[in-house]
Regions:
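Short, glycine/charge-rich beta-strand/loop segments that flank catalytic centers
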Residues: 66-70, 92-95, 105-120, 138-147
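Short phosphate-binding/catalytic loops that engage adenosine nucleotides
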Residues: 58, 132, 450
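Active-site pocket-lining segments that scaffold enzyme catalytic pockets across diverse folds
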Residues: 95, 100-106, 124, 128-133
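Alpha-helical recognition segments enriched in aromatics with Gly/Pro capping
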Residues: 1-32, 47, 118-332
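N-terminal, positively charged nucleic-acid-binding surface of large information/translation enzymes
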Residues: 8-13, 17-103, 454-461
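Structural preference for alpha-helix termini/caps and helix-kink/transition segments
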Residues: 269-272, 276-465
């Protein structure tokens, strides 16, 4: 297994801290709004990593957090006259629904920052005791980055990073020093009683503490195997996490760092400030979650993905092919083709080379369809094909539906009944040799994007886009 390590800026062999075990921490959302396509892409990227490792024989522990203490949450809760707990719970539920729709496997642990306040306080106390942190006159506590000789080692390769972007805060020793604890400022602020005084943790200390409490190994030079997240988190968030972990515990946070690329909307970086954020829930109104997943995983996780509906519909054709083949082999039993399994897994073991894996899949779909055309009653072949498709379902998380359900996506139960009634009406018209009426019904349904297919077993229908 090879993965791209952001810190080393190259592909390296994955050599876990404990043989055949993989501990992964993925930075989750700050829950003050609905999740957007950037969140979806990150979740799917590292879901693919997890699935690949598991199918390669690793026991995977994946932790993905919820940041439920943050200035953005506090400000929005104040605006909507809600507590931060009420507001964050709304968006945690929304995020969970969205990821379920995208068939992202549930993490081993899903910690909330609010559940680990004591751990954060202990870590800050350690940093103060070791003289890596200092308090300013308003009670805030900062990490003194000048004490960490390796500060910047994770993100320094990115020449666009400028510490000056952070801005000056009165009494900070260096511009890049970052807040560990924000003291309670009175009205409209949120604070928790603690030995540090009333206040709340900074963003970066939240993740480091949750890593330590949920995943960290002891007696190793690294706490976990892989720390992952979006490229936008590399600096300052991941840099600061790495720094405070070194300072507090004398070890590196992660052996490997992985980052997924940005999502652009019509060739422009997606961001709330530009007003072009595309929420997952809005995309799901138009497209099934599996169709979205299939599209989002089709571009290598480190590349920029330029979201547009034309490409999405093109990618759907691949999913259609999977279900067409599945339709032909349902109800058979057999073993997977070992060469197919080996070849496609090796693609994914090469830093999740999904483009190459999909090429292998396309070849399998084409060749097995051709073999079925030549020998449609070959049960052994059908069983092998179904086993191949089952492996794709486990590896890529697509192709898991019943084909009939897939080809009727987006049609309500009442609409289905209306279609069935029309099919019966057409059947009667044909029996009475009223072929003009039968054709008229077919055309009427076509206008509703419903295609009819007459088979020896009767008429079936599908919805098309």
């Amino acid at each position: 297994m090879f993965i791209y390590d952001t810190k080393l800026k190259q592909k390296v062999p994955f050599e876990p801290l404990v043989e055949k075990k993989a501990n992964i921490y993925v930075c989750g959302p700050t829950v003050y709004d609905d999740a957007h396509l950037g969140h979806a892409r990150s979740a799917i990227a590292f879901d693919l990593l997890r699935r690949t490792l598991e199918l390669s024989g690793y026991e995977v522990m994946l932790v993905r957090n919820f940041t439920d203490i943050d200035d953005k949450i506090i400000n929005k809760a104040l605006k909507e006259n809600k507590s931060i707990q009420e507001l964050s719970s709304i968006y945690i539920e929304s995020y969970t629904r969205d990821l379920n729709a995208l068939n992202v496997k549930k993490p081993s642990i899903e910690p909330k920052a609010s559940e680990y306040l004591d751990a954060m306080v202990r870590m800050i106390e350690t940093l103060l005791e070791k003289n890596f942190a200092y308090r300013v006159s308003n009670g805030d506590i900062y990490l003194d980055t000048s004490k960490d000789k390796d500060y910047g080692s994770l993100s320094v390769h990115n020449s666009s990073i400028e510490f000056g972007r952070i801005g000056l805060v009165q009494e900070k020793r260096l511009e890049q020093d970052f807040v560990l604890w924000k003291s309670y400022k009175g009205d409209n602020d949120v604070g928790f009683d603690s030995p540090l005084g009333k206040g709340r943790p900074g963003w970066h200390i939240e993740c480091s503490s949750m890593v330590f409490e949920t995943l960290a190994l002891t007696d190793t030079p690294y706490q976990i195997d892989i720390h992952a997240g979006g490229a936008d988190l590399l600096f300052p968030h991941h840099e600061n996490e790495a720094c405070q972990t070194r300072c507090a515990f004398g070890v590196e946070l992660a052996k490997y760092w992985m980052h997924n690329g940005f999502v652009n909307i019509n060739n422009e970086k997606m961001s709330k400030s530009l007003g072009n954020s595309f929420f997952i829930k809005d995309a799901l109104k138009n497209y099934d979650g599996e169709i979205l997943r299939n599209y989002l995983l089709g571009v290598h996780y480190r590349s920029v993905l330029n979201f547009n509906e034309e490409d999405l519909l093109v990618s759907k054709k691949r999913l259609d092919k999977i279900y067409r083949l599945k339709q032909r082999v349902l109800g058979t039993l057999g073993g997977i083709n070992p060469n197919f399994k080996k070849e496609i897994l090796e693609c994914m073991q090469d830093d999740l080379n999904v483009s190459k894996a999909l090429s292998v899949l396309e070849s399998m779909l084409a060749s097995t369809n051709e073999k079925l055309d030549q020998n449609p009653k070959n049960k052994a072949l059908k069983g092998e094909i179904l086993a191949n498709l089952k492996f794709i379902e486990e590896l890529l998380g697509i192709g898991f539906k019943d084909p009939s359900a897939y080809f009727q996506l987006g049609v309500s139960e009442s609409e289905k009944q209306e279609i069935e009634n029309k099919i019966e009406e057409r059947k009667r018209a044909k029996a009475q040799k009223d072929f003009l009426k039968a054709d008229s019904i077919r055309e009427e349904l076509l206008k509703q994007k419903i295609a009819l297919m007459d088979t020896p077993q009767g008429t079936i229908w599908e919805k098309f886009f």
